[in-house]
């Protein structure tokens, strides 16, 4: 797995699948200092942690009608440095536009809203590619597995409460 840091904090960590060219999971914290409705940089780039041939190249998006679906949403990172890292191909999966722009985007907003109830909400977003028979092609014509399912796991922390009380709800 790999971790991206900004100058002041750990941004996110992810577990990379070189064969399918997707992160099985991306883990990140949400709190007042990190999340909000930040402006998108749309600075699509290569992840400096991996060589070009081991990651999707997505300057122009996926071919075949798929959106570049963020696992760590761009809106969850306010600083330019942290936001740029959300546009690496290693944070993307091929998503149908209807899912990416509607249901999943709404769910991401719900998670941001829930994060306000805690000092920190720890989020793990992931995708499943087992059994996938579909691929999308990146700008270098590499095949990227299209996930068959997505998930989010959440853990809320409040410094004034016990662990059981922090995660209830």
Show where each model-derived region lies.
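Domain-level detector for secreted/extracellular nuclease and nuclease-toxin modules, and
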Residues: 1-169
């Amino acid at each position: 797995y790999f971790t991206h840091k900004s100058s002041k904090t750990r941004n996110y960590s992810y577990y990379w699948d070189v064969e399918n060219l997707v992160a099985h999971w991306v883990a990140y914290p949400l709190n007042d200092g990190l999340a909000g409705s930040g402006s998108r940089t749309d600075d699509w780039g290569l992840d400096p942690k991996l060589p070009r041939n081991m990651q999707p190249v997505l300057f122009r998006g996926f071919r075949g009608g798929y959106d570049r679906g963020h696992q760590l949403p761009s809106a969850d990172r306010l600083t330019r440095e942290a936001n740029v890292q959300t546009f690496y191909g290693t944070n993307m999966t091929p998503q149908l536009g209807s899912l990416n722009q509607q249901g999943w985007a709404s769910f991401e907003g719900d998670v941001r809203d829930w994060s306000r109830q805690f000092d920190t909400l720890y989020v793990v977003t992931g995708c499943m590619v087992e059994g996938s028979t579909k691929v999308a092609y990146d700008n270098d014509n590499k095949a990227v597995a299209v996930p068959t399912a997505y998930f989010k796991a959440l853990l809320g922390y409040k410094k004034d409460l016990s662990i059981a009380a922090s995660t209830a709800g």
